Amino acid sequence: MSADCPSFPVSTSGLLAAWPRLLRLPTQHPAGFYLVCIAVFCERWAAYMLGSSLVLMLCERYGYSRADALRLAGIVNAATYLGTLPGGIASDRAGHPARWLGASMGLLAVGYAALVLTAPAALWLALGLLLVGHALFKPNTQAAIASQYPVGDSRLDAAQILFYIAVNAGATLGSTVAGLLIHRTGWSVAFETAAVVMLVGLLALILGHKVLRLRPATMQHLGPDVAKLGTSPPALRAKLIGALILAMVLYTIGCGQVEGSLLLWAQDRTNRALLGTEIPATWFVGLPAVLVMLLAPVQLGFLRQLQRRIATPRLVAWGLCAVALAFAALLPAALGHTEQRASMGWLVACLTLLAIGELLVAPLGLSLLLRLAPPRFIGALVGAWYVSRALGFWLAAEIGVLWIGGSPVAMLALLMGLSLAGAVMLWWASRDTFKRRDQNC
């Protein structure tokens, strides 16, 4: 455990500071880092209880058409990412990311509790609270983690992988529990559970506030270190940054189908029978998170070897190729008899390839952006990154609407083409910037 983290042997904070060692977790990380992981685990659990079933809830509970439900789900996803820019600016000005985390978790708990009510007005109130809560929560998780480490600390790389595992563990449990509760008890109990999960995370933050002390000296972000990394001419770096952000839009269009079109594919076109029972469609939404959680430690072990052979931009490009292959895996099922449900193996293959693509695109893409960005523009470019995710989710919903009335084969071909276009664009943009190895990224 970091020497910066105090030990309080008899207090609640002392117990929280000691629990990573008791659970045999890597003790080189501060206890405050693990506390943030608990918070994001709870937030993702609750978020996926709604996200994995939002389209179905809008159709079954509120009478939306599938097209309108997909559009609203896309708007909600987009607004969640767009809100992080003003949310991050507000928290930067006020400071104390741990306090903002606590406030955002309280808003999220109230938002999920409001979904227990069935009135349409309660739906809009809940969505509003959830959007504000997520706008504050997302940027402050990274700020809170950064506050636990000295600037340039080499442990941050491993910390981000562990953080990513916590994110996907919460997402996995959320979609799994949602499928069970909605199928057996209905929507209200599922959202009551989501609210309770958020309150548990908030309680952990309150009890452990002493190990989440803000260290102002570590809140200088990565400016001096980033300035040493990119030695390519500014014009070439700007070209790669632009290609990376555009590629992120195209990647998000593909991965954004999981909670929309692929959820409906699982519901309507997939034979979900297994051992005498039927697997809930929402479980397929959580499968990529399970796979990411399992594969992330493998990625951590092999990443340095991969980067010695392949430049980081091209690793991201290979991730986009994996997304294209994911939709190619569904082509045999789409070309089969429409009156028969397809084997779930095709959908599982698709989701597995999407998980591999996610591991290569999401963490490596953001890391590459931070390394290429001029120090004074890091905040703006990270905001542009999230805006690209928002645009991608909106376009994903629009493509999902076209999928309802169009040819599945044509939609799969479109999604394959968009992902491959992103890969080619990154490959082209990096050909001059990274001619040999990824030494500067």
Predicted regions and their residues:
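Short amphipathic helix-loop junctions that connect adjacent transmembrane helices
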Residues: 50-68, 260-281
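Intracellular loop-helix junctions on the cytosolic face of multi-pass helical membrane proteins
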Residues: 2-27, 31, 151-152, 178-277, ...
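Intracellular juxtamembrane helix-capping segments at the cytosolic ends
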Residues: 136-150, 360-373
